[in-house]
Design a protein with these regions (language model features):
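Intrinsically disordered, low-complexity segments enriched in polar/charged residues with Gly/Pro
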Residues: 31, 45-46
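Short Cys/His-rich "knuckle" micro-motifs
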Residues: 36-43, 70-74
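Generic detector of short, locally flexible boundary/turn motifs and exposed helical patches
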Residues: 5, 25-26, 43
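Generic preference for hydrophobic/aromatic residues in regular secondary structure cores
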Residues: 1, 34-36, 81
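Short cysteine-rich loop/turn motifs with clustered Cys
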Residues: 10-39, 61-63
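Polybasic, low-complexity binding patches
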Residues: 3-7, 47-58, 66-109
């Protein structure tokens, strides 16, 4: 059985579908079309307790996702992702993107 934090930070299929449509089925960085599988990038990383909710997830192709995660321009990519999420999610609040101990899974949305 998975731990609550693991469940809270993974991205459910319905969230991937919402994010992929919201992001026009394209990588938010290079604007190339990508399959729905690529709606899988966390703004607040899973390792930091980033929730698998639309406000924390964006669509990125493999190349851009790697660059955003650990490339020499990762801060630039993160800034673009933050602005994108703020624009697409009117009530975006970075503090609400983290898993908090005792949080129920249905509190994510």
């Amino acid at each position: 059985m998975k731990h609550k934090r693991t469940l809270a930070t993974e991205i459910p299929p319905e969230v991937k579908a919402i994010v992929w449509e919201r992001d026009d089925r394209k990588c938010i960085f290079c604007r190339r079309y990508v399959p729905m599988f690529f709606a899988n990038a966390h703004y607040i990383k899973r390792s930091q307790g980033g929730l698998g909710i639309p406000e924390n997830i964006f669509t990125a192709c493999d190349r851009c996702h790697r660059e955003e995660d650990a490339g020499k321009n990762s801060l630039k990519y993160r800034d673009i992702a933050k602005k994108h999420l703020q624009e697409k999610c009117p009530n975006w609040d970075e503090e609400k993107l983290y898993y908090k101990k005792g949080m129920e899974l249905d509190e994510r949305f």
